[in-house]
Each structure stands twice: as C-alpha cells, then as structure tokens.
C-alpha cells in the first residue's frame, strides 16, 4: 500500500505541474504593459500509507486529495490576477482567423473617452515604472500619450502629445485593433439588431451613382431602395447603430442634389422613355415631335446642288429602292451644327429635286451667300453664270461676230435693192457702210487695247480678220458699178 500511495502522489504532482504551466502560458499571451512575477505555492500532499486501511478507504482518500489540490490551484495568486486584469481593462476576447483559436486580449484604455492603440513600451533608466506608448486610433489623428504604471497595474503618470482633430467616439463604440484589420469584428450590444454597414454604404453609393435605383410606390411619395444584394466582402464590419428611415431619405435627396440637375431626371414626365412588353424602347409622342423637325423643299432644276445660303459637306450616298436616282446625304459644315439634309431626284419628274432638312441651324447664315429662288428657270441661271464667267478676250470676239452679222445683213439689203436704186445712190450707201465699219473697227481696237493681255497672238488674229472683212467689202462695192453697164 505504501508503494501505491507513492505512485499516486507522483502522478498528482505531474498533473499539478502541467496545470501551472498552462496558467503561465495564458499570462504570457496577455497584452500587459508589464510582466509581474507570479509565485505559485505548491502544497505537497502526503498520503499516509496505512497498512490497515482497505482499498475502498484508499479510493475515497485519493479523490479527496485531488479535489483539495484543484481548490488550492484555483485559490492561487495567478487565478486572482486573471480576473483583476479583466476588470481593469474590460477587454474583449476576439478570435483571429489567421492565428487559429489562440485568444487575443486587448487592454482597454478609455479613461479619457478616446480610443488608443499601444505601439511600444520600455524601461526608463532611473525609473521603477514601465512606460507605455499609445496613439489615437482615429485615422490621421496625431494625438499620442505616454502612461507609467506601477507593479500593481495602477496608472502613475500620463503625458499627452498633440491634440485630437475629431470628436470623442460614442460610449458604445468598440475599439478596433488596427493590427488585425483582416479579422472579423462584431459589436456586443444589448439586444439591438445589428445591420451590415457595408450593405448600407453600397446602397447609398448606388443611389448617388444612378437615380434609377430609387423607385416611387404607387399612391405615395415614399421612396424605397431597390433590393440589391451587395457583393460579399470578406471581413465586413457589423455595427449596432441603426439609422432611421428618415435619415436614409435625406441622404438620398442630398446625393441627388450633389450630382446636379442634369442627372436628376423625372421618370414620370411625358418625355420619359417607356418600355414595351417585348423589351423595345419607344419614345413618347412629345419627344418624337420635338426631335422630328423636318422640312421638305421641292425645286425644279436640272442640277443636283441647290444654293440655300448655307455650306454643306457630303458624307454619304445610297441607292433608293424604286428610284433610278441615288440619294445624297449632307451635314452643315459649321462646327457643332446638328442640321442635316438629304437630296434626291423625283422618279416621276426628272426636273424635280427633293431636299429634306432635319434640325435647325444654331448659327446665322454665312456672309457672301446668295439664295436662289426655287421658281427660277435654268436658262436664266445659265445666262447669269455665263456672264459671270466672261473674259475680255471672249467679249471682243463676240463683238466682232456681231459686227460681221450686221455687215452680212446690210449686204443682203444692197443686193436686193440695188436694181431699184439709181446709179447715184449706190456710192452714197457704200460710203456710209465704210464709215460704220471703220468706226466699229476702231472701237474694237480701243477696247482690245484697254483689255490687252500677254497673249499677243489673239490680238493679231482679230486685226487680220478685220482687214479681211474690209477687203471683201471694198471688192463687193466695185461689183455693182459694172453690172448696170453690161445690162
């Protein structure tokens, strides 16, 4: 029995040592500013070996010693220190997905109402206290502070650096560990219904991006958000703050005002688009009448281009079914002008040109453009174009040809009336003709000299033609004098 008692005592000592090691590991993992040595008193249990006791009494004695040993372990200073840490810091045990099931205890530093994050500690020479360094957890806040704690965990000295550029957080806010941004944090609230802030922000962003996500219910002016599922975000933040429905409405209205009046459309207006059952988009009659401003002009001309006062640029042409004439497409050459036109000739009347205008000009007619009337005859247009294209040489040649026609006409008159006139009247008429011819030739020479050009060959030809015409007239004047003598 003595040997059995020694074996049981040794087993109990091994179990007790394992339990104390586990407690030491838990204390080592805490985020405390200082490490306090823990003295663990181990009570040695002595099992009296009684040769006279029975096995049943020994079995009763062994559980009693084990229970007493566990009570001693629980009542040790280590177990008293653990609840003290939880009371002073009020930490939240958050389970990290990256570190498995190892507990992470965060120290609560909320005495001044702000959230702080510890980023270092050190032992100062000549100071018995451990100095800890903290910075504010608010983004871009430069406030810092230093704490000095005693061995018992009491704050001895606090020094602040910088000022906070933000208001104090709410009393129920949860301090988030910035080093564990990828972890999933949940707020512990008293019976409040938690909502996903990521989904709320997603909905508000969708409303500001496209107002189509806001729909009006029939018979009321209450605006409701379309139920859209936000993308699943790993590690989304859940908070216990639930905004009322009125706040959501004001956020929607403000976001629509920020985007401007152009993006905010009234989808109940008559000019809005309406969707058919088949899915095709149909424009309302109001919008169709405003956009379809067409003007059709009929012009009787043989030319395919009509001058309407504006400048056009051709950008296409195609054949029309049932018509042998193609259709040409033009757009106004003025920058930014939306006017277009297409021109085609009528298949029933070849002289009829049909011009269809689309849109309105947003500018004045360019200067130097003359509008031709639709009822103007093509012959008149041709005459004007011919007069504009005349040159000095062509005008002189035309005057010479006119003179030749006049001379031929006078010759015919003299031949027909020569027998009725007397012999004395013949020479008088011939002299008058000569004088008229000379005057016209002199006038033509003066005109040609005034409008002379480097090309001298044409002037020489005109003079040669004039000399020949004068020679022929003189030879013809001599013939009538001999004819009466022979008769």
UniProtKB/Swiss-Prot annotation:
The UniProt-reported impact of residue 340 to A is: Normal DNA-binding activity
Q: Name one GO cellular component term.
A: nucleus
Gene3D superfamilies per the UniProt record, alphabetical = WRKY domain
Q: What is the effect of changing residue 314 to A?
A: Impaired DNA-binding activity
PROSITE patterns xrefs: WRKY
Q: What is the effect of changing residue 317 to A?
A: Normal DNA-binding activity
What result is annotated for mutating residue 317 to K?
Reduced DNA-binding activity
- The record places the motif (Nuclear localization signal) at 273-277
At which residues is Phosphoserine found? 76
Q: Where is this region: Disordered?
A: 69-104, 255-287, 380-487
What does its record list under induction?
Answer: By salicylic acid (SA).
Keyword terms, alphabetized? Activator, DNA-binding, Metal-binding, Nucleus, Phosphoprotein, Repeat, Transcription, Transcription regulation, Zinc
Subcellular location(s) per record: Nucleus
Example of a GO MF term: zinc ion binding
Q: Which InterPro entries match?
A: WRKY_dom, WRKY_dom_sf, WRKY_plant
The remark listed among the other comments is: Binding to target DNA is mediated mainly by the C-terminal WRKY domain, while part of the activation domain is located between positions 210 and 285.
Q: What is the protein's given name?
A: WRKY transcription factor 1
Q: Which gene encodes it?
A: WRKY1
């Amino acid at each position: 029995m003595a040997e059995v008692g020694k074996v049981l005592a040794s087993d109990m000592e091994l179990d007790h040592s394992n339990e104390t090691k586990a407690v030491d590991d838990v204390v080592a993992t805490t985020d405390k500013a200082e490490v306090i040595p823990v003295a663990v008193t181990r009570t040695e249990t002595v099992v009296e070996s009684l040769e006279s006791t029975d096995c049943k009494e020994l079995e009763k004695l062994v559980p009693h010693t084990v229970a007493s040993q566990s009570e001693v372990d629980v009542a040790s200073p280590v177990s008293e220190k653990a609840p003290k840490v939880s009371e002073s810091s009020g930490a939240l045990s958050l389970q990290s997905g990256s570190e498995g099931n190892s507990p992470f205890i965060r120290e609560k530093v909320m005495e001044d109402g702000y959230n702080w994050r510890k980023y270092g500690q050190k032992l100062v020479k000549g100071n018995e206290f451990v100095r800890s360094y903290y910075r504010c957890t608010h983004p871009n806040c430069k406030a810092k502070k230093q704490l000095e704690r005693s061995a018992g965990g009491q704050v001895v000295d606090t020094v602040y650096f910088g000022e906070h550029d933000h208001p104090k957080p709410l009393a129920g806010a949860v301090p988030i560990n910035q080093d564990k941004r990828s972890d999933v944090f949940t707020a512990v609230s008293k019976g409040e219904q938690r909502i996903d802030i990521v989904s709320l922000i997603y909905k508000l962003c969708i409303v500001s991006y496209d107002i189509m996500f806001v729909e009006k219910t029939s018979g009321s002016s209450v605006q409701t958000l379309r139920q859209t599922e936000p993308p699943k975000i790993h590690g989304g933040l859940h908070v216990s703050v639930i905004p009322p429905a009125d706040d959501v409405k004001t956020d929607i209205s403000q976001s629509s005002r920020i985007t401007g009046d152009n993006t905010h459309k009234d989808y109940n207006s008559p000019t809005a688009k309406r969707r058919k059952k088949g899915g095709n988009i149909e424009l309302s009659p109001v919008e169709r009448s405003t956009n379809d401003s067409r003007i059709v002009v009929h012009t009787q001309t043989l030319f395919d281009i009509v001058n309407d006062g504006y400048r056009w640029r051709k950008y296409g042409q195609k054949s029309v079914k049932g018509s042998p004439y193609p259709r040409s497409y033009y757009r106004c050459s003025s920058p930014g002008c939306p006017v277009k036109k297409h021109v085609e000739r009528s298949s029933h009347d070849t002289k009829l040109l049909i011009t269809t205008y689309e849109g309105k000009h947003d500018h004045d007619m360019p200067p130097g453009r003359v509008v031709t009337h639709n009822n103007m005859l093509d012959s008149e247009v041709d005459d004007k174009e011919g007069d504009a294209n005349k040159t000095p040489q062509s005008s002189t040649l035309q005057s010479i040809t006119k003179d030749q026609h006049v001379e031929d006409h006078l010759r015919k008159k003299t031949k027909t009336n020569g027998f009725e006139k007397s012999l004395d009247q013949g020479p008088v008429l011939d002299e008058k003709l000569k004088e008229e011819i000379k005057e016209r030739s002199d006038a033509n020479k003066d005109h040609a000299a005034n409008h002379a050009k480097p090309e001298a060959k044409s002037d020489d030809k005109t003079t040669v033609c004039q000399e020949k015409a004068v020679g022929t007239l003189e030879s013809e004047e001599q013939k009538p004098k001999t004819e009466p003598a022979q008769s």
